[in-house]
Amino acid sequence: MKKLLSIIALNLLAFNSFAVELKTTNPYPNLMPAQVTEKVNSMGVRKFIISTSPNVDGSTWDYILSHISSGNIEWLRIVPILSTGVDAGSAEDLSTAVATALPKNASGVLSVLNDSNVSISTESVCSLPFYQGTEAELNQYVIDSIRALYKNKGGGKCLQKLIETTGNSKSFSEGD
């Protein structure tokens, strides 16, 4: 009986440790854009971004970026707010997320670009800010983005940057 109780106690302790770890890596599960805005207003944008653990895989920051990457307009609308509190690493993350949304919602992406803010400038977002993916995936992204931008009246500057970057790039090699 004592052995059974000690096993149960250890299992509860292990589960509790797992739950605590889960909570520290994602303190805001199921976060919506309106809640992000509320948190930013109450905490300040920089403190909020720090609280999302931008350097931890599976964090709230990753959750936010995945929704921005989807091209959902509500998530894209909070990009200008978030961009004012990013550091170098999270700025790159944000640029990449916005760039990923480009072929999915070019109008939404173009509406949040701001050339006076490096992390969401045309230069950063429209110049293939990717470090991962295969050549086929990158090629498909370029084709889909060109199509999306070509169909959008305001897409000329981003389209020009995308084509310029593609034209100036060297051949792709996995593992570089």
Residue ranges: model-predicted function:
Residues E21-D176:
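Non-catalytic all-alpha helical scaffold/repeat segments
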